[in-house]
């Protein structure tokens, strides 16, 4: 069998030499007649869109998991760095972590195996309690060992790639950090009552300021009682416009035009303030008589 395989004959089952193999490789004929067809079929094959989508989803999921793993390792590293920055003692006469005095007058101390610093028993961790001679580690060295164990650095002989979390802006995105909801404060009833009183007072002031002089004069004229010395005067007759005049009877005294300017009405209101009837009415003030047949009476508008 071996002679048949390694013989120099031209049998088709004999392995060709290197020259023939190189020639067949250039001609893409392969080892047998079926080799070229298999290669051709392999080249013509292509993936369907569904298969391509599934492959892309697997790749994207692997990338997301990789990013999550890097963020997890970054949180471990940040915690370790924070502990290293918050040391308060020198590790010789004081505890490395809390800064408590050590010695005869202070707390009892233990010696960390990794960093060779002294810490108190509260800040130290006993790594091997079953041994005759206990092994102590400080919290920083114990956390560093935990980081190497949980990140896989012991396998890679170094810390893998990690992503540190953001400082202050990133705390809001942390699922473990949520700001307390602030309840809206209800308005006090006292403040609402004060605002209502203020609105009422303001409306009264505005409404009093919006009255015109003509309204005041017309109301005062209608409420004024009839003079005792005049008879037959038409006081019940409705007034017209502010510029109109009232006619006097033939047998009674004549009256001047009833329209007055704004200054005269204001002057009359100031002078008539003192001659007010206790019952609420205003008394007329007659003008001095002039020599003649007719007597005129001045009407004061308020």
Swiss-Prot record:
Residues binding Zn(2+) 1: 95, 98, 120, 123
Annotated signal peptide: none
Residue ranges occupied by any RabBD domain in the UniProt entry: 41-158
Database matches in SUPFAM superfamilies: FYVE/PHD zinc finger
GO cellular component, as recorded: presynapse; secretory granule; synapse; transport vesicle membrane
Subcellular location(s) per record: Cytoplasm; Cytoplasmic vesicle, Secretory vesicle membrane
Zinc finger (FYVE-type): 89-146
Free-text function comment from the UniProt entry: Rab GTPase effector involved in the late steps of regulated exocytosis, both in endocrine and exocrine cells. Regulates the exocytosis of dense-core vesicles in neuroendocrine cells through interaction with RAB27A. Acts as a potential RAB3B effector protein in epithelial cells.
UniProt protein name: Rab effector Noc2
Organism (species): Rattus norvegicus
């Amino acid at each position: 069998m071996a002679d048949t395989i390694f013989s120099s004959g031209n049998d088709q089952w004999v392995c060709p030499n290197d020259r023939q193999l190189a020639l067949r490789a250039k001609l893409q004929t392969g080892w047998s007649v079926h080799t070229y067809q298999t290669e051709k079929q392999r080249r013509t094959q292509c993936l369907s869109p569904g298969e391509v989508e599934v492959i892309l989803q697997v790749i994207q999921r692997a990338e997301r998991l990789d990013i999550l793993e890097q963020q997890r390792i970054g949180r471990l590293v940040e915690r370790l760095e924070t502990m290293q920055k918050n040391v308060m003692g020198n590790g010789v006469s004081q505890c490395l972590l809390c800064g408590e005095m050590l010695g005869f007058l202070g707390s009892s101390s233990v010696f960390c195996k990794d960093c060779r610093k002294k810490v108190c028993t509260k800040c130290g961790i006993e790594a091997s309690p079953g041994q005759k001679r206990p092994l102590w580690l400080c919290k920083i060295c114990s956390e560093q060992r935990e980081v190497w164990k949980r990140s896989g650095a012991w396998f890679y002989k170094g810390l893998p790639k990690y992503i540190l979390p953001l400082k202050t802006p990133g705390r809001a995105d942390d699922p473990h950090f949520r700001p307390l909801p602030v309840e809206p404060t209800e308005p006090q009833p006292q403040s609402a009552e004060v605002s209502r009183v203020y609105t009422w007072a303001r409306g009264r002031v505005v409404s009093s300021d919006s009255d015109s002089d003509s309204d005041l004069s017309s109301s005062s004229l209608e409420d004024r009682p009839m003079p005792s010395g005049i008879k037959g005067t038409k006081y019940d007759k409705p007034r017209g416009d502010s510029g109109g005049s009232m006619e006097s009877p033939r047998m009674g005294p004549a009256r001047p035009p009833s329209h007055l300017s704004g200054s005269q009405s204001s002057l009359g209101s100031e002078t008539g303030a003192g001659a007010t009837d206790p019952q609420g009415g205003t008394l007329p003030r007659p003008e001095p008589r002039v020599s003649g047949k007719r007597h005129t009476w001045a009407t004061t508008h308020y």
